[in-house]
Structures are given as structure tokens and as C-alpha cells.
């Protein structure tokens, strides 16, 4: 856990990156080309790759080239951004749902706190993308109203606004990425710790079960083999006239049956005792795991608590 939290602190101190002027025109395509702002962005998850495509398209729009200007006059740009935004939020929701399913044996209160944290981060990211789309739709209306006039000042204001929106989008994307990474790391560590604990508890129990099986099965097997040998010898000696031996054989069968029932009853009693010990060992283990998860959530909230849990209404 110490290594996990040390890595988290280093990540948080790294900041969200600088505001960078747009580079040369970048045509949108299937490959995710994030630019210098996202040099440290690791797009390994589907939602991260989808967000990278949104970011790449936004960088191309911000160049405000002649081709971009032509498409802005139509609804093509806003429609494309809408599709990319919907795809991103769909993947974010899927990732969040998968993580919540993997939380395992934690209390409902802890699950609710984790869900609230991720929901707030997800909402901030969605609000950022929605504002980008709304601003471009507004620019489209302003551009159509100024046909035949100079739009240099209008383009300058849009470019400056988009830079601010990109910076906010990057900040909130990294915040969501950090939260997901911390909880996923906690799940992996908790699972590994649980497996080791189970092995420590189940190892002696497995050995005990094997010992009980040996103690029960060996006498029965030896008894059956001895009885079979005696019966075979008597039948051979008698020349197979088994009628006069039937009563004796029946008595021996009943004797073996009684022994089997006695041994089975002993096994049942030992199994019930085994079940009771197993339950008494597992209940503290589950409670300990729930407590560890509650502590993990509190540490995450303290580490990234500088970011509000609700979507800000004030436009930056």
C-alpha cells in the first residue's frame, strides 16, 4: 500500500500540463494523435482512446483553416464532435460500471462513495466536451451572420476560448484517469492480498481434510480387503457350496455395514466442525477487507480532494 500511495502522490504533483498554442494543421483520422499537451497520456483503455480521438479532432478544428471554416458553416463539425463525445462517454460509463462490479466485498457505503467520486469526475469531463460543442455551434451562428465581413477578430476569440477549454478538458481527463487507476490498483492489490490470506487459511484446512480422509478410508479399505480374503478362502475350501455359509456371510456383511455407518457419522461430525471453523475464519477476513477498502477510498479523497465532487457551473 505504501508503494501505491507514493506513486499516487507523485502523479498528483505532476500537475495537469501547460497550455500550448496550436501547431500546424492536423487532419482527423483513425489514429489518435494527441499532440504535445498529452505527451504523458497513456491511452490504453477504450475510453482513453475514444477521448484521444475527440481531442485530435478538436486540435484540427482549432487550426481554423479554410477547410475547417467551410465545415463550420455547415453542421458537419458539431455533428462529428457529438458522435465522438457520445462514443467517449459510452466507454467511460462502461469502464466505471466494470470497476464497480470488481469492488468485491466492500460495504454499500464504500461502494456509494466510490461511485459518487467517479460519477462527479465523469460529469465534469462530459460538461467540458459539451461546452466545446456549444461554443462551436455559437461560432457557427456568428460566422453565418458575418458573411462577407472580416472574421479575424471572431476567429481570435474562438481560438483563445478553445485553448482554455482544451486545458480544462485535459485537467479533468487526467483527474478521471488518476481516480480510475487508483481504484483499479486497489482492486488488484486487494485481490492479491485476499488470495494470499485464503491460501494461509485454507492450507492447514486442506491438510486436515486430507488427514481425515486417510483416517476414514484406510480402515474401511483394509477391513473390506480382509473380509474378501476370508470369504474367498472359505468358498474355495468348501468347493463353492455356499448355502451352509450364507448365514455367516450375512453376519459379516452386516458387521461391515455397521462399521461403514459409524465411520460415515464420524466424517459428518468432523465436516460440521470444519464448516464452523471455516466460517469463523472468513468472517473476520471479509470485515478486514471492507475496512481496507474504506481506508483506500478516504485516502483517494484526501489525495485528489482539491477537485470538487460536483460539476462546476461557472464557465472558465
Curated annotation (Swiss-Prot):
Location of region: Lipid-binding and lipoprotein association: 213-289
Biological process annotations from GO: acylglycerol homeostasis; cholesterol efflux; cholesterol metabolic process; lipoprotein metabolic process; melanosome organization; phospholipid efflux
N-terminal signal peptide: 1-18
One Pfam family linked to the record: Apolipoprotein
Keyword match Signal: yes
Post-translational modification: APOE exists as multiple glycosylated and sialylated glycoforms within cells and in plasma. The extent of glycosylation and sialylation are tissue and context specific.
Residues involved in heparin binding: 165-168, 228-235
Chain segments carrying region 8 X 22 AA approximate tandem repeats: 83-254
Region entry Specificity for association with VLDL, spans: 277-289
Coarse class of the protein's main subcellular location: secreted
UniProt xrefs under InterPro entries: ApoA_E (IPR000074), Apolipoprotein_A1/A4/E (IPR050163)
Keyword Cytoplasm carried by entry: no
Region LDL and other lipoprotein receptors binding: start-end pairs: 161-171
Ranges of the Sequence repeats in the UniProt entry: 83-104, 105-126, 127-148, 149-170, 171-192, 193-214, 215-232, 233-254
Protein's cellular compartments: Secreted; Secreted, Extracellular space; Secreted, Extracellular space, Extracellular matrix; Extracellular vesicle
UniProt keywords, alphabetically: Chylomicron, Endosome, Extracellular matrix, Glycoprotein, HDL, Heparin-binding, Lipid transport, Lipid-binding, Oxidation, Phosphoprotein, Repeat, Secreted, Signal, Transport, VLDL
GO CC entries: chylomicron; extracellular exosome; high-density lipoprotein particle; low-density lipoprotein particle; multivesicular body, internal vesicle; very-low-density lipoprotein particle
Family membership: Belongs to the apolipoprotein A1/A4/E family.
Its job: APOE is an apolipoprotein, a protein associating with lipid particles, that mainly functions in lipoprotein-mediated lipid transport between organs via the plasma and interstitial fluids. APOE is a core component of plasma lipoproteins and is involved in their production, conversion and clearance. Apolipoproteins are amphipathic molecules that interact both with lipids of the lipoprotein particle core and the aqueous environment of the plasma.
Quaternary organization: Homotetramer. May interact with ABCA1; functionally associated with ABCA1 in the biogenesis of HDLs. May interact with APP/A4 amyloid-beta peptide; the interaction is extremely stable in vitro but its physiological significance is unclear. May interact with MAPT. May interact with MAP2. In the cerebrospinal fluid, interacts with secreted SORL1. Interacts with PMEL; this allows the loading of PMEL luminal fragment on ILVs to induce fibril nucleation.
Name by which UniProt lists this protein: Apolipoprotein E
Organism: Diceros bicornis minor (South-central black rhinoceros)
Amino acid at each position: 500500500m505504501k508503494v501505491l500511495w507514493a506513486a499516487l502522490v507523485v502523479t498528483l504533483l505532476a500537475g495537469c500540463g501547460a497550455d500550448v498554442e496550436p501547431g500546424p494543421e492536423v487532419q482527423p483520422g483513425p489514429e489518435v494523435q494527441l499532440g504535445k499537451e498529452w505527451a504523458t497520456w497513456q491511452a490504453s483503455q477504450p475510453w482513453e482512446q475514444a477521448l484521444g480521438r475527440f481531442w485530435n479532432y478538436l486540435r484540427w478544428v482549432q487550426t481554423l483553416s479554410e477547410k475547417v471554416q467551410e465545415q463550420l458553416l455547415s453542421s458537419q463539425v458539431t455533428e462529428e464532435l457529438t458522435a465522438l463525445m457520445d462514443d467517449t462517454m459510452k466507454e467511460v460509463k462502461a469502464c466505471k460500471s466494470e470497476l464497480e462490479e470488481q469492488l468485491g466485498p466492500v460495504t454499500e457505503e464504500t461502494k456509494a462513495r466510490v461511485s459518487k467520486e467517479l460519477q462527479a469526475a465523469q460529469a465534469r469531463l462530459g460538461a467540458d466536451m459539451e461546452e466545446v460543442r456549444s461554443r462551436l455551434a455559437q461560432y457557427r451562428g456568428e460566422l453565418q451572420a458575418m458573411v462577407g465581413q472580416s472574421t479575424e477578430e471572431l476567429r481570435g476569440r474562438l481560438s483563445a476560448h478553445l485553448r482554455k477549454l482544451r486545458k480544462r478538458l485535459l485537467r479533468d481527463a487526467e483527474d478521471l484517469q488518476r481516480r480510475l487507476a487508483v481504484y483499479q490498483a486497489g482492486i488488484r492489490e486487494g485481490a492479491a492480498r485476499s488470495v494470499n490470506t485464503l491460501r494461509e487459511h485454507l492450507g492447514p484446512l486442506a491438510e486436515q481434510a486430507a488427514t481425515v480422509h486417510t483416517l476414514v478410508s484406510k480402515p474401511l479399505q483394509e477391513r473390506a480387503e480382509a473380509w474378501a480374503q476370508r470369504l474367498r478362502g472359505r468358498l474355495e475350501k468348501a468347493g463353492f457350496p455356499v448355502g451352509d455359509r450364507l448365514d455367516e456371510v450375512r453376519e459379516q456383511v452386516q458387521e461391515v455395514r455397521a462399521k461403514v455407518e459409524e465411520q460415515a457419522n464420524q466424517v459428518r461430525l468432523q465436516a460440521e466442525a470444519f464448516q464452523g471453523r471455516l466460517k469463523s475464519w472468513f468472517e473476520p477476513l471479509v470485515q478486514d477487507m471492507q475496512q481496507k477498502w474504506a481506508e483506500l477510498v478516504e485516502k483517494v479523497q484526501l489525495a485528489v480532494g482539491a477537485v470538487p465532487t460536483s460539476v462546476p457551473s461557472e464557465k472558465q
